[in-house]
């Protein structure tokens, strides 16, 4: 439905106007691309932060959703979402308590770690509650914000895998449009490098005796391309839902 000039003039500002039909087409296009590549899709909800859109994504075939913080995960759980990855290292006792309170309400909760200290705090909390928490180790593939450097990933993975109360099932990264350490507009090159770096991390961790399953990567600019490399098992794009010219 298109708004007339008269209807637009009557809107209170600031306001957000969403083309739901276009959003649904974007959801379906990204899902189709992931399916064609044989890669799971776990969209990030930080763009919309609305359970109604997250449910659309899951109904279209998404494996689950990704959140940036505990409060987003709480909102999504209240809205009926049951498979949630909080893709930011869980630091601070109050955040951990809230995350652990979510676990019984969900079919699957995945938490993030990127250091021994972060994992130790999670391990202690899980043991105190009698829980076994699924975790993923974040790999720094060039963004330089969070994550363990590639060369230290295997050693840290071994230590985390030995911690009681934790089950290390995978690795993840957020790289965005970075190639050889610098910003780029070439999403194909960025995606190829991202896939290769994550495949290398996975190989080194498995060679160290840690049997991870999930290798998760991809942003909206690189999501389709990194899925098509065949080097990752899951992609987590987010902004694609409202970017009507991206796909």
Name what the model sees in each region.
Residues 28-31, 100, 123, 203:
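Generic structural signal for well-ordered alpha-helical scaffold segments
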Residues 44-180:
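Active-site-proximal beta-alpha core segment in soluble small-molecule metabolic enzymes
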Residues 1-18:
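Generic N-terminal amphipathic, Lys/Arg-enriched alpha-helix
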Residues 1-3, 22-53, 66-68:
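N-terminal glycine-rich anion-binding loops that anchor highly charged ligand groups
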Residues 21-29, 193, 197-200:
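A non-catalytic, amphipathic alpha-helix used as a structural packing/dimerization or gating element
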Residues 134, 141-247:
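Active-site loop/helix belt of alpha/beta enzymes
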Residues 18-21, 110, 189, 193:
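Short, surface-exposed alpha-helical recognition segments that flank or form part
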Residues 18, 114, 237:
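A conserved hydrophobic position in a structured secondary element of the catalytic/binding core
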């Amino acid at each position: 439905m298109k708004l007339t000039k008269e209807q637009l003039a009557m809107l209170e500002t600031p306001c957000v106007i969403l083309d739901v039909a276009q959003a649904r087409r974007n959801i379906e296009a990204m899902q189709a691309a992931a399916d064609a590549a044989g890669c799971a899709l776990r969209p990030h909800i930080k763009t919309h932060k609305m359970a109604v859109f997250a449910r659309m994504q899951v109904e279209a075939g998404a494996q689950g959703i990704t959140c940036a913080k505990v409060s987003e995960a709480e909102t999504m759980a209240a809205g009926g979402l049951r498979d949630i990855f909080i893709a930011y290292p869980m630091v601070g006792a109050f955040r951990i308590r809230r995350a652990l309170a979510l676990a019984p309400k969900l079919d699957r909760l995945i938490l993030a770690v990127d250091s021994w200290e972060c994992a130790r705090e999670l391990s202690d909390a899980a043991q105190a509650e009698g829980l076994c928490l699924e975790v993923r180790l974040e790999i720094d593939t060039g963004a330089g914000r969070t994550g363990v450097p590639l060369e230290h990933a295997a050693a840290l993975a071994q230590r985390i895998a030995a911690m009681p109360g934790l089950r290390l099932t995978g690795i993840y990264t957020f790289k965005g449009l970075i190639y050889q350490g610098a910003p780029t507009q070439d999403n194909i090159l960025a995606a190829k490098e991202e896939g290769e770096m994550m495949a290398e991390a996975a190989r080194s961790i498995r060679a160290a005796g840690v049997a991870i399953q999930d290798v998760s990567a991809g942003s909206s600019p690189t999501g389709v391309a990194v899925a098509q490399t065949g080097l990752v098992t899951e992609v987590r794009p987010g902004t694609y839902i409202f970017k009507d010219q991206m796909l």
